[in-house]
């Protein structure tokens, strides 16, 4: 008689975690950071149609890495959740914390009850109401439903260690938009493999066509989300020489 296959609950959870982490690590990285006027999203994403960064509600933004079809389902569900709550109660009742909790419950349920976990990691960003001094808030939600709040920046997907190191070395809370873009792009350039025909010592260069950039701008009265592309983005990108310089003083363009 053939003995049935047995795996302990701990082993099953470890296998699911490993599957999800590997899937997330295969993707390109995303950096979300707070700056002087709100929240900046910078994703390495050559696609013009399949977005990693999007608007959720008036003052809420969304960023994700992993399997596109999975985080797109989560994004759309989040928009429906926010719209229904805002319509049923008040637009001010739609908060980043409520959406982050909803995402955490959904991902936690999928991780424990479904045959395969979602291979995604997401960030919900929130800025205060127009005219308020409420600081921006970032919520990171992982594949197993774990949730953490951040005040400065979040790095997700790909090879995160060199990106996190670069961000920690140069990040400052009151960066202007251009400095924040240069910092995030410079950090992303350190996170991927060296281009073919170059050595690992030579940094990558990410141009406008390889980036998806957006902001939650606290100076906008209602819908704070805005994409930055084309010539507006190109003017903000760091030059190759600038990425090799030491981190500048506050107000200058960081590497």
Swiss-Prot record:
Belongs to the peptidase T1A family. Residues 238-249 have a biased composition (Low complexity). Residues 229-255 are annotated as: Disordered. It is found in: Cytoplasm. Component of the proteasome core, a large protease complex with broad specificity involved in protein degradation. The R.erythropolis proteasomes are able to cleave oligopeptides after Tyr, Phe and Leu, very poorly after Arg but not after Glu. Thus, displays chymotrypsin-like activity, low trypsin-like activity but no caspase-like activity. The formation of the proteasomal ATPase ARC-20S proteasome complex, likely via the docking of the C-termini of ARC into the intersubunit pockets in the alpha-rings, may trigger opening of the gate for substrate entry. Interconversion between the open-gate and close-gate conformations leads to a dynamic regulation of the 20S proteasome proteolysis activity. HAMAP family: Proteasome_A_B (MF_00289_B). It comes from Rhodococcus erythropolis. The N-terminus is blocked. One of its GO terms (biological process) is modification-dependent protein catabolic process. Pathway: Protein degradation; proteasomal Pup-dependent pathway. GO terms for cellular component: cytoplasm; proteasome core complex, alpha-subunit complex. The keyword NADP does not apply. Disulfide bonds: none annotated. Keywords: Cytoplasm, Proteasome. The 20S proteasome core is composed of 14 alpha and 14 beta subunits that assemble into four stacked heptameric rings, resulting in a barrel-shaped structure. The two inner rings, each composed of seven catalytic beta subunits, are sandwiched by two outer rings, each composed of seven alpha subunits. All four combinations of alpha- and beta-subunits (beta2-alpha1, beta2-alpha2, beta1-alpha2 and beta1-alpha1) yield fully assembled and proteolytically active proteasomes. The catalytic chamber with the active sites is on the inside of the barrel. Its main location: cytoplasm. InterPro entries: Ntn_hydrolases_N, Proteasome_alpha-type, Proteasome_asu_bac, Proteasome_sua/b. This is Proteasome subunit alpha 2. One of its GO terms (molecular function) is threonine-type endopeptidase activity.
């Amino acid at each position: 008689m053939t003995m049935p296959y047995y795996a302990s609950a701990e082993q099953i959870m470890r296998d699911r975690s490993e599957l999800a982490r590997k899937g997330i690590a295969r993707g390109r990285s995303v950096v979300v950071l707070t700056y002087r006027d709100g929240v900046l999203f910078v994703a390495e994403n050559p696609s013009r149609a399949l977005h990693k960064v999007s608007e959720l509600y008036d003052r809420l933004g969304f960023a994700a890495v992993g399997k596109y079809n999975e985080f797109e389902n989560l994004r759309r569900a989040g928009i429906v959740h926010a719209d229904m709550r805002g319509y049923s109660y008040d637009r001010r009742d739609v908060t980043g914390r409520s959406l982050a909790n909803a995402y955490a419950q959904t991902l936690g349920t999928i991780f424990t009850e479904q045959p395969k976990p979602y291979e995604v990691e997401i960030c919900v960003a929130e800025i205060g109401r127009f005219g308020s001094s409420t600081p921006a808030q970032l919520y990171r939600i992982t594949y197993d439903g774990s949730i953490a709040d951040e005040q400065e920046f979040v790095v997700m997907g790909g090879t995160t260690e060199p990106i996190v190191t670069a961000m920690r070395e140069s990040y400052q809370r009151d960066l202007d938009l251009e400095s924040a873009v240069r910092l995030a792009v410079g950090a992303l350039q350190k996170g991927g493999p060296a281009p073919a025909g170059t050595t690992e010592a030579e940094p990558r260069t990410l141009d406008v066509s390889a980036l998806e950039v957006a902001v939650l701008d606290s100076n906008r009265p209602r819908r704070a989300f805005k994409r930055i592309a084309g010539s507006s983005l190109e003017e903000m990108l760091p030059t190759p020489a600038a990425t090799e310089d030491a981190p500048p003083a506050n107000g200058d363009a960081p590497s």
